Amino acid sequence: GLVGSEMCIRDRFVSVVRNEKEITSARWMTTGLGVYELYVNGKLIGEEILKPGFTHPYKTKRSFTYEVSNALSKQAGAENVFAVQVTPGWWADKIITYSGQQGMVGAKVAFRGVLELTYADGSKAYLGSNTSDWKAGIAGPVKHAAIFDGEEYDARELPGYDTLDKLSTPEKNTEFEGEILPSNGGEVYFREDLALSPQKAYLWKGVTGESEDAYGKVVITKEYAAGEEMVVHPGETLVVDFGQNCAAVPAFEFMAKEGTQLNCRPSEILNDGNGAKSRGMDGPEGSCHRLNLRTPDTGMLLDYTFADHKDYTTYRPHRTFYGYRFVSITADQEVRIRSIQSIPVSSITQQMETGSITTGNKLVNQLISNTLWGQRSNYLSVPTDCPQRNERLGWTADTQVFAETGTFFANTADFFHKWMRDMRDTQSPTGAYPGVAPLAQYGASPTDMNRLGWSDAGVIVPWVVWKQFGDTQIIDENWAAMEKYLNHINETKYDHHALSAENGNYQWADWLSYEPLESCSGRHTAKDGSGTLPEAYDYWNYLSANYWLIDAGMMSDMARATGRDAAKYEAMAAQAKQYILDKFLNADGEFKTAIFNTMQTPALFALKNKLVEGVAKENMMKRLRDNFAEHGNCLQTGFLGTSILMPTLTENGMSDIAYELLFQRKNPSWLYSVDNGATTIWERWNSYMLDKGMGPQGMNSFNHYAYGCVCEWMWETMAGISADTSEPGFKRIIMKPIPDKRLEFVNAEYNSAAGIIKSSWKYEGDQWIWDFAIPEGAVALVTLPGESQAHEYRAGSYQIVK
C-alpha cells in the first residue's frame, strides 16, 4: 500500500536517498494526480505510459509498483536519485472538465510513492513521499502536455532528473480523498511491434486554383522515396502518410540548429476536391484536414524546439497521444528528418491478442483489419469512442455493442474488470449507470443517466466477460451495482418520462441511424421547435423496454452461474416481455406505432427478444425483408440496431440478407468506407462521401469502433465459433458455420479461455470442406450448414466434406 506517504504538489519531484546499509532489493510503489513518469538515477522506470490511467478523478487512482534494484547503487553509503515528472493528463485536464468551463484545468498535479528497501541483513526500510525529504520544481523540457492539447517540448532545457538544483519544498496535496488500488487492467503501452513507417511523403509550397469557394490544390515540390532523408525549410509543409489510422505518437530522428521550432500536426484524412468549402474542406487539396478534431488550432499539437545538438537526436511524446494517419510538419528553420515513425499506443498488447480471421475477399479482410485497429486505438485505459478529437471518453453504448467482438480479438477480461470499477464509481445513487465512464467532461452528469442502450452496459459487459471467459469474479464484483440498477429500471419500467429527471428528457437511442426516427439528426424533434415527436417517445420507451428484458435475462444467467436467485430475474424478464407485447405490438405482429413498421431496428429487437411467433413472426419477417429490398439491400440501423442486426437475421433464417449486407458497397454499408480508403471503422456510415465530401464536422470521427461489431457475427457465423452460456468460457462451444461462396474461404483461429479453437472452410467446386479443431477439455456442439441437428464432438481435429 501507500501508507505513510503524502501527495506532493508540483510537476517535477526529486529525492536523494543515501543507503544506510547494503541493499539487496528495492520496490517503488507509486501513483499520481496527473500522468507521471519515474526515474532512478536518470533511468526511466517501467514500460507503461500515461500512468496512472483514466479513472474517476475523485474516487479511484491506480498504483504501479516496480522492482528498481537494477537501477540502484546498492553499496552502503551510496546515493541514489529518485525523480518523478507529472503532467496534467487525466487530472488537471480538459478531458475531466465540462466543456466551456474551467473545472479541473489548472488543478495542482501531485505524486505519491513508497520506496521499500530490503537490506543485506534482511531488514527493511520504507521511505514515503513527503514534504521534508523531497524537493520539487517546474519540469524542464516539457513545457506543456495534456491528453487533448498534445505536447510542447523544449530540448534546450535539461530534464533535471538527477539533480536538486532549482528545486524547493513541495506542498502537501489534500485534493484527492478517494481509494488507491493496484493497477490490474487498462495499462497503456507503446506497440513497438506495430510501428508504422511512411507509405508516402511529399513537400508542398503554395496552391493553385484558389477561389472564394475553394482553397485550391497544393503544389507538390518534392516526393520522398521510402527511407529517404526528408528536409523541411521555412515556408514548406511536409505531409507524411503512414498508411494506417490509429492512436499513436510520432517518433523522430532529426537535426536542426539550436532554437529551431518544429510543428507537427496530426490528421486522419487529407483535403480533396480542390479544397471545395462546399465539401467541408478546411484547406487545399493534398493538405491535412483537421476540422473534425474540433479544436484544430489549439488542440492535438506537437511543438518541438531543438537544443544545440551537433548530430541527429531522437524524440517522441510520452505524455499524450494522438489519433491520425497523416502528419503535417513545418519549421521556422531547416530541419533534417532522418527517420519518422508512427508508434501505436494501446492497452491491447501483442500478448493479449487472441484471434485472427481471414477470408478470400480482400474487402472483407480490410473490414476485419479496420475493426482490429479500431479496437487497438480505442481500448486505451478505458474503452473510448475515438482517439483523435477533444472527446476520447468511455462511452458506454460504444463499449457494450463492441464488447463481444473485442473478446475474440484480445483477452479483455482484466481491461473490463478495471472499467467496470469506473462504471461503479460513476453510478448514480438511484442505481442508474452513466452514458460515459469514468466521470469526464460530459456524458456522466446527473442528467446523462439511464440513457437506453448506454446505461445497460453496466449489465451487458459483465455478462459478455462471463460468457466469453467463464469469469464469475466480474459478476461478484458488480452484482450489488447491477441489482441496484435492475431494481431501478424495473420500478419505473424503464419509462422515459418516469426517468426524465435523470435522462435529461433526451435519448441517444439508435444513434446515427438512417431510420425515420433518429436522435442526432433532429428527426426526433419537430422542425418548428415544438419539441420531441410523440412517436419518438414511443420509440425510446420501446427500445428501453427491450433492454429491460435483455438485462433481466442476462441477470438470470449470471445468477444461476453464481448460485444466486435466478427466478427473480426470470420473472422480471417475463414482466418486461408482457409489457412490450401489451403496449407496442398487435397480435398480427404489426407495431401499434405505425412508423415502427417502416423501420428495421424495431423489428430486429422484436425478433431478437422472441416477442413474436407463428403468423405474427412471419408477418414481421416479411416486412423486414421488404424493408431491406426497398432500401436496395442496405441497412438503415445505428449503433444499437447494428449491434444486433447480423446475429438476429441469422438466428431467424435470414442469413442470406446478412451476407447481402456484408457485401453491400453502397452507402450505408460497411464496405462503403472500405472502398473510400478507410483503415479504421468510421463513426458515421457517411463520414466521407466521394460525391459530397466530409460528413458533419462537429462530430465526424474516422476511428470509431462501434460498427466493427459486425466481426462478432463473422466469428460466430462465418467461422462458426461461439460460446455456450451453459458452460461459459468455451468449455462448451457452439460450432455452426454458415458459409457463402463469395468469401471463397474462411480461416479462423481463436485462443479462447479453454484453449485454441480452429475453424477453416473452403469451396472446391461444389464441395464445401471444413477443418476444425477443439481444445482439450472442451466439447463442441456442431451443426452443419443446411442442417438443424447438432452433434457433439470431443477434443481433436476434424474434417468434414459436404
Language model region names:
Residues 5-6, 10-389, 414-415, 437-439, ...:
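Extracellular/oxidizing-compartment recognition motifs
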Residues 26-27, 249-268, 327-330, 398-427, ...:
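Alpha-helical support elements that line or immediately flank enzyme active sites
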Residues 35, 129-138, 334-370, 376-377, ...:
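Active-site acid/base region of carbohydrate-active enzymes
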Residues 47-58, 269-295, 413-530, 669-692:
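Helix-terminus loop motifs that line ligand-binding clefts
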Residues 82, 153, 390-391, 409, ...:
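C-terminal capping/lid segments that line or modulate ligand- or cofactor-binding pockets
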Residues 103, 107-110, 114, 128-165, ...:
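Non-catalytic C-terminal accessory modules of carbohydrate-active enzymes
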Residues 240-242, 318, 393, 452-456, ...:
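Short helix-capping and inter-helix turn/linker motifs at the boundaries of alpha-helical repeat units
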